[in-house]
Design a protein with these regions (language model features):
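Short beta-strand/loop motif that positions the catalytic acidic residue
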Residues: 247-249, 253
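Alpha/beta-hydrolase
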Residues: 180-246
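Catalytic active-site module of serine/aspartate enzymes centered on a nucleophile-bearing elbow/loop
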Residues: 274-309
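Conserved hydrolase catalytic core segment
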Residues: 124-158
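Conserved alpha/beta-hydrolase
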Residues: 72-94
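Active-site glycine-rich loops that stabilize anionic/oxyanionic intermediates
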Residues: 56-59, 251
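Conserved alpha/beta-hydrolase "acid-adjacent" motif
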Residues: 254-263
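Flexible "cap/lid" loop of the alpha/beta hydrolase fold
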Residues: 144-179, 220-227
Length: 309
């Protein structure tokens, strides 16, 4: 691992080269076993460096399947354990939405921390949306060898609140009763919040393939974080053991506009470790699953390869 510096670096992403040996591929992917314990046992048995993927609201662990295959191909061992009680499939999730209700940021952060503490090697941690917030919490606990937070949900101390973010969160925050519910998105809501940067056909495909209900609780926790000193939606950005961190932002993201990602970057930049940021042009909140996922995956992999072998 390279020594941490006392300053932050801002850089532009290089295009992901499909001709390089670490190119994304879904041919013969080595998909992780289903249960968290099986994934932990496999990771420890391989002796390779683990990479833990954390999804956000309205998605399942399967949203990381292609990423997991890429990281396995690059020599890491991928874990996609999911949030507590996550169903195995989108169909099951939509048939039984109540399993998502009442999940809190603290509960899910502790769930992933417990998984990581069972690993023989400190992992790299990648998270998208609320998974990005969880990744920062885990890094703040000193449990991550390197962290990538992609379109991360805001945490305490992040002040910008763009109108598009309010509109994207309105299906949940617009009804206080949703605090204790599992809330699905209609196609129109998903189109605005996730799939605004893709065409209509792809938006329909993404909604059908990936969209599931989500716990309303984390959104209310994030929305009130700056008014609640005891909020669970906060990360220890000052911990010197936080490790290198990359903040990735989609230029056209409605749910987490660049103003939020930039504020997260500034907050994390106070850490003595390396903190870097990338804004991916012309991309929305679905950037980890849409047609351009390879570029974002490549940027993330290249960052992790610099720090974790």
């Amino acid at each position: 691992m390279r020594p941490a510096s006392n300053h932050s670096i801002r850089f532009c992403p290089r295009r992901f080269d499909p001709e390089k040996g670490d190119r994304p591929t879904t041919e013969n992917p080595q998909q992780p076993p289903v249960t968290a314990d099986e994934q932990i046992d496999r990771a420890n048995a391989t002796g390779r460096t683990p990479v833990v993927f954390i999804h956000g609201l309205w998605l399942l662990p399967s949203s990381w399947d292609r990423w997991a295959a890429v990281f396995e191909h690059a020599g890491y061992v991928a874990l996609t354990p999911g949030w507590p009680d996550d169903p195995d499939t989108v169909e099951e999730a939509n048939a039984h939405p109540d399993v998502f209700a009442h999940k809190t940021v603290g509960q899910v952060a502790d769930h992933f921390s417990a998984i990581i503490e069972k690993l023989d090697k400190a992992p790299a941690v990648l998270g998208h949306s609320f998974g990005g917030l969880l990744a920062q919490i885990i890094a703040g606990r000193g449990l991550s060898a390197a962290t990538v937070a992609i379109d991360s949900a805001p945490l305490r101390g992040v002040l910008p609140l763009p109108i598009s973010a309010l509109r994207a969160a309105a299906p949940v925050l617009g009804n206080p009763a949703n605090h204790h519910r599992a809330v699905p998105l209609t196609y129109e809501q998903f189109r605005y919040a996730f799939a605004n940067a893709v065409d209509e056909d792809e938006a329909q495909q993404l909604y059908k393939e990936f969209a599931v209900p989500a716990s309303g609780t984390p959104l209310f926790q994030a929305a009130t974080a700056n008014f609640n000193p005891w909020t669970q939606a906060k990360a220890n950005s000052n911990n010197p053991d936080r490790g290198p961190m990359l903040i990735v932002s989609g230029e056209n993201d409605h749910t987490v506009p660049p103003a939020i990602s930039n504020a997260i970057f500034k907050k994390q930049s106070r850490n003595p470790g390396i903190t870097e940021t990338v804004t991916v042009p012309d991309r929305g909140h679905a950037l980890v699953v849409d047609h351009g996922w390879r570029e974002v995956c490549g940027v993330s992999l290249n960052f992790i390869k610099r720090w974790v072998q």
